[in-house]
């Protein structure tokens, strides 16, 4: 059974120009650029948490997938096991996190990398703005 709900193909091989989390507004905005120079903006709303690693100056995305909540807990079991007791992402236990994600309709967006930045965003909605 596939964990992928949908793929966002507009981001393949895009360079990341910038990203900004607005914790007060519960949002995260990422601006990317295609190889041909077109801008693609990604706007997450209803942000619960995000986790990025391997962030460098010249990040190139492989793509982004929305995955199932079960898939998220399988894929990030080790990370969550070590971090949830420190309040990341926003709960005291794995069970509480799952309940909150269900209650608040939080979706899981996994960002894969060709170079640099990768990780996930937990948010209610995502919108891509393409030219």
Q: Residues of each region from the PLM?
A:
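Surface-exposed, interaction-prone regions used to assemble/regulate multi-protein complexes
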Residues: 1-131
